[in-house]
Amino acid sequence: GFVHNRSAEKVADLPPELVLADLADFSSRDADLIVELAHPDVTRVHGEAFLQQTDYMPLSLTAFSDAELNDRLQSTARERGTRIFVPHGAVIGLDALEEGRDTWEEVSIRMEKPVRSLDLANDPDHDATQITGRTTLFEGSAREICPRYPRNVNSHAAVALAGIGFDRTHCVLVA
């Protein structure tokens, strides 16, 4: 096994044999499962390589809103016999969504978060300092919301993955 963090000081207290300085060297560790809990960019950059060798559980599920990346990851997993595990995270009942995906016509998810906990860096329409009351930041598809708020809507991505997909899952984010 291994632990990687782009900030070496955050893993400085761990035994050195556990720390992997360069994530590209993951194959030297022979892991049975790689769990990502950093950022969707880890999946974009390393996801296919991970799945070439082992099972993968990304917690930053918004990366899967990129249809091409999703297709490549699913294809790699099929070809290599590895698995992508989708954690339920904050959403209970993903198994029921998956079981009923052929019967659902519409799936909606609405989330309210305090503005101080939102990353609005990719939101050209809102400035956190200007939000003073309940404000709908976004309403649309999961495919649209995920790249706009990649650190805040992993639950939306989980619902889309388990259910009827990124284009047909309706999302609302309220500050």
Language model segments and positions:
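Conserved acidic residues
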Residues: G1, E17, D32
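Beta-loop-alpha module in the N-terminal Rossmann-like domain of NAD(P)-dependent dehydrogenases
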Residues: A21-D25, R29-F50, A63-D66
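NAD(P)-binding Rossmann-fold cofactor-contacting core
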Residues: G1-L14
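Active-site-lining helix/loop region of Rossmann-like oxidoreductase modules
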Residues: I84-F85, A90-A175
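Short, ordered loop/turn segments at secondary-structure junctions
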Residues: R6, L61-F64, A90
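A short helix->loop->beta-strand "cap" motif at the edges of active sites that frequently abuts
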Residues: E17, Q52-D55, E79-T82
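Rossmann-fold NAD(P)-binding glycine/threonine-rich loop
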Residues: D41, S60-R83
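General beta-strand structural signal in soluble alpha/beta enzymes
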Residues: E36, P58, R83-H88
